[in-house]
Amino acid sequence: MKGNMKVYWIKIAVATWFCCTTIVLGSTARIFSLPTNDEEETSKTLGLDTVSFSTKGATYITYVNFLNELRVKLKPEGNSHGIPLLRKKCDDPGKCFVLVALSNDNGQLAEIAIDVTSVYVVGYQVRNRSYFFKDAPDAAYEGLFKNTIKTRLHFGGSYPSLEGEKAYRETTDLGIEPLRIGIKKLDENAIDNYKPTEIASSLLVVIQMVSEAARFTFIENQIRNNFQQRIRPANNTISLENKWGKLSFQIRTSGANGMFSEAVELERANGKKYYVTAVDQVKPKIALLKFVDKDPKTSLAAELIIQNYESLVGFD
């Protein structure tokens, strides 16, 4: 009888320990949002290429190497006048995006999804949550960051849309410290009542320091040469960003002599306007071109598409 009682009390003790442990650990897991194995394997199961960059111990050299690796992962198809040309389209969801894993000195991580045909940011994951721009394609929303709690933001990824959340290029600092803070803010807003303005301002830093810097050697060098400082995009930087589509079109459709069919208006740092009429005038500033059909029969249609797109996002 005593032996049976001893076994009985042991069972009670074990059961009590199990229940308490489950409650405590379960609560702790929710507080810290520890990632599951499924979440950690998201990029692997999709077969997406991933490029990583950490602000911890970062130098301008590691930053430049990161941008070069990203350009390679985007897998441009051919070139125009020696400038790599991005893919025309992507039919395989598993190859339409590249993940950029950004981490900071605190170990906070944000995985940014980038479209390989345009270098546009479509969404990102922090902890067990993912967020997508309002205008992100359905293929991105449905196919990326599975096993996460998904949210469509009420604003898009265009500059005018970001400005609607008080995120302006002219007043946004760029550099290693702003990027570190941006990653931190994205991580801190992995909650139900997130702050749209903090997300928008943080994503604007990412867009400038990743997407735009990958497109333009000029912007890469601006950040590289002021890496440990805070800089803000001047008129020359903003005008290049706004005219990427038109520059790509003119370069792609120009003949062997590299002359543009139509001059492209740009601005200097002081806001003074000037015009470029040939590839050689802007080639040193551009690292990637957006695909534009070179066929004369479709080039006009392509130009109209670019003009329509740029009017939608607020570009000239």
From Swiss-Prot:
Keyword Electron transport attributed: no
Active-site positions on this chain: E212
UniProt xrefs under InterPro entries: Ribosome-inact_prot_sf, Ribosome_inactivat_1/2, Ribosome_inactivat_prot, Ribosome_inactivat_prot_CS, Ribosome_inactivat_prot_sub1, Ribosome_inactivat_prot_sub2
Single GO molecular function: rRNA N-glycosylase activity
Family of the protein in this entry: Belongs to the ribosome-inactivating protein family. Type 1 RIP subfamily.
Quaternary structure, from the entry: Homodimer.
Name the UniProt record assigns to this protein: Ribosome-inactivating protein gelonin
Record gene name: GEL
